[in-house]
Design a protein with these regions (language model features):
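Bacterial Sec-dependent signal peptides at the C-terminal "C-region" and cleavage site
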Residues: 3-4, 8-28
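Intrinsically disordered, low-complexity linker and terminal regions at domain boundaries
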Residues: 184-192
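Short beta-strand-centered aromatic/proline hotspots
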Residues: 152-161
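Soluble periplasmic/extracytoplasmic beta-strand elements of cell-envelope proteins
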Residues: 123-125, 155, 192-194
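Short, solvent-exposed secondary-structure boundary/capping segments
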Residues: 162-172
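Compositionally biased, proline/threonine/alanine/serine-rich low-complexity intrinsically disordered stretches
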Residues: 233-243
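Cell wall/extracellular polymer interaction/catalysis modules
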Residues: 22-150, 163, 175-183, 197-233
Length: 243
């Protein structure tokens, strides 16, 4: 989000990729359809909204609170904009020189203790827990981010301001074909974030594992065959023994 960081643990400003990156976007890989489940398949499952948040979130500082968090049996989701998070381990595109709001910390760390790299790891940002939504979402939870006809699998990798939603890493934006430079990039609307319940990738930095897990859970989500859901059983009392 395009606001200053709150604290190290809740660091979440909308962060910026360098302007020079504009010249390299076409050279980066783009996830047109990262998996067998297409964007239309996922969007068809999140058409309605059974709201679970107590209120609604703002997409940016000063914007109206208009974004609810919704739930199905298998996932939570929201539809918002996409602001660029460029926090974490510095690199050529995300650093103090290229990003005036840069923070070298992310709320969750890699298995080696280092902070995540926004420019190399696809991750999303969830709001810090508040009265609006006490989500219990863990670092490493698996998400499918949908924009137009593209699906990018990612993990929950950072926490944002308590009242703002709609943010993802530089790498997530790049994978969706969105300009990752926040000075002229991001997406104003049309981004759907789906976080699969009870999912987690370890280590959090293993993107291949996030993709494999995301593909599997997306297939189950679309088919309505979520793991752990038992088929209904008969409640009839047992038959009396024969004499």
């Amino acid at each position: 989000m395009r606001v200053p960081s709150l604290t190290l643990a809740v660091a979440c400003a909308a962060l910026l990729a360098p302007a020079a990156a504009r010249h390299h976007i076409a050279e980066e890989p783009v996830a047109r359809r990262e998996g067998a489940v297409g964007a239309a398949d996922l969007l068809a499952k999140v058409r309605g909204c059974a709201q679970i948040s107590r209120g609604r979130y703002r997409s940016d500082e000063g914007a109206p609170a208009a974004v609810p968090v919704c739930a199905t049996r298998d996932a939570v989701f929201w539809k918002a904009d996409l602001d660029i998070d460029c926090d974490g381990r510095p690199g050529p595109r995300c650093n103090r020189r290229t990003d005036p709001l840069f923070s070298a910390a992310t709320a969750f760390q890699q298995s080696d203790g280092r902070d995540l790299s926004a420019e190399s790891l696809p991750y999303i940002v969830v709001p810090a827990v508040s009265r609006i939504w006490d989500h219990g979402v863990r670092g490493g939870s698996v998400a499918a981010v949908v924009y137009r006809n593209r699906v990018q699998y990612a993990v929950v990798g950072d926490l944002g301001p308590r009242g703002i939603i709609g943010e993802a890493s530089y790498a997530t934006a790049r994978g969706l074909g969105i300009n990752p430079d926040p000075r002229g990039g991001g997406a104003a609307s049309g981004v759907t974030y789906i976080v699969f319940k009870d999912s987690q990738v370890k280590p959090i930095e293993d993107h291949a594992a996030a993709v494999a897990t995301g593909q599997r859970l997306a297939r189950l989500f679309v088919r309505g065959k979520w793991p752990g859901v038992r088929p209904p059983t008969s409640r009839r009392p047992p038959a009396a023994p024969r004499r």
